């Protein structure tokens, strides 16, 4: 889902035009390569900062979604105080290391997809300028599934580490988690538990978030163009949302989309935890997991457990990324 944000950023980016190189310089190709390397690193670092900022909320959400027995009796925000008391403040960042590692290959796949599609659109379809950047960004967004599949094992490891509580560690670190899951849970297949609800949850999330953001933008610029809009830097005759309004609309769109797709997120997390949970044998498939969660915990405290944390994290994560 973060890939949708990455695709939008890619679509908005445009490398500087190639200029004749002076004698002894690296030439236009090397300059363009450096530009994309710089953009990739900047995007990855921004992603790391954004994820680290909301890491405590992510860790608490995992504990609540899977009803960790140490914290299941607490409300949504109480674990933010209980975790530091029991595990120290670093306990709020368990699993964040695996997330940081995941961001770089995830971003690399997005950038490679964008470049591949941009070249294809330019050479095969003859489209250039803003149109081909938007088309390439859209197609790169569709490649998010590839990025998810390639980096999914790191997400599984991240969730396993985040669910552990001090004094009851099953895994001593990232490498040990990889080795243990591979050895005890069916080899590579053990790293892809929960992939189906992940993929199924991406479709409603993407469609609802884009539709909601587009609607908010259209309505806002139609009824309050002076208050909410500003002239585009590319074309002064075109109005775009002001930065803080764009941020707010993006946060609202994400919150609505996450509400609709959240049961898939709960299902994914519980399946990713696999043998760590005592009900593992009863939740081998997506259908079994959803049925178990609904039957034992209902809708509010089961399929939507921890949703309010998603609302809280929408704005700060977007703000830091910007």
Swiss-Prot record:
BP GO terms, sorted: mitochondrial coenzyme A transmembrane transport
Nucleus as UniProt keyword: no
Compartments, as annotated in UniProt: Mitochondrion inner membrane
One GO CC term on file: mitochondrial inner membrane
Segments annotated as Solcar repeats: 34-120, 128-219, 241-322
Molecular function via GO: coenzyme A transmembrane transporter activity
Record's bilayer topology term: Multi-pass membrane protein
InterPro entries: GDC-like (IPR002167), Mit_carrier (IPR002067), Mitochondrial_sb/sol_carrier (IPR018108), Mt_carrier_dom_sf (IPR023395)
Domain of life according to the entry: Eukaryota
Keywords noted in UniProt: Membrane, Mitochondrion, Mitochondrion inner membrane, Repeat, Transmembrane, Transport
Family in the record: Belongs to the mitochondrial carrier (TC 2.A.29) family.
Functional description taken from the UniProt entry: May be involved in the transport of coenzyme A in the mitochondrial matrix. Very little is known about the physiological function of this carrier.
Protein name per its UniProtKB record: Solute carrier family 25 member 16
Organism encoding this protein: Rattus norvegicus (Rat)
Gene that encodes the chain: Slc25a16
């Amino acid at each position: 889902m973060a890939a949708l944000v990455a695709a939008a950023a890619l679509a908005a980016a445009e490398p500087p035009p190639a200029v004749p190189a002076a004698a002894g310089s690296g030439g236009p190709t090397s300059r363009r390569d450096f530009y994309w390397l710089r953009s990739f690193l900047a995007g990855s670092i921004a992603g790391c900062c954004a994820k680290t900022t909301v890491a405590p909320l992510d860790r608490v959400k995992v504990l609540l979604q899977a009803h960790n027995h140490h914290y299941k009796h607490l409300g949504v925000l109480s674990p933010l105080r209980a975790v530091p008391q029991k595990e120290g403040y670093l306990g709020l960042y368990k699993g964040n290391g695996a997330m940081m590692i995941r961001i770089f290959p995830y971003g690399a796949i997005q950038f490679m997809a964008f470049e591949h599609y941009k070249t294809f659109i330019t050479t095969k379809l003859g489209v250039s300028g803003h149109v081909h950047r938007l088309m390439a960004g859209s197609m790169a967004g569709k490649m998010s599934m590839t990025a998810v599949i390639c980096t999914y094992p790191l997400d599984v490891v991240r969730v396993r580490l985040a669910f552990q509580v001090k004094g009851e560690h099953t895994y001593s670190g990232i490498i040990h988690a990889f080795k243990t899951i591979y050895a005890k849970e069916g080899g590579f297949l053990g790293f892809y538990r929960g992939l189906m609800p992940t993929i199924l949850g991406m479709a409603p999330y993407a469609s609802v978030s884009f539709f909601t953001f587009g609607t908010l933008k259209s309505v806002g610029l139609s009824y309050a163009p002076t208050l909410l809009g500003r002239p585009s830097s590319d074309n002064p005759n075109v109005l775009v949302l002001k930065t803080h309004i764009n941020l707010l609309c993006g946060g609202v769109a994400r919150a609505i989309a996450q509400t609709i797709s959240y049961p898939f997120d709960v299902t994914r997390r519980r399946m990713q935890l696999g043998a760590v949970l005592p009900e593992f044998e009863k939740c081998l498939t997506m259908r079994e997991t959803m049925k178990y969660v609904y039957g034992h915990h209902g809708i509010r405290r089961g399929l939507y457990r921890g949703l309010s944390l998603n609302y809280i994290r929408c704005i700060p994560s977007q703000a830091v990324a910007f």
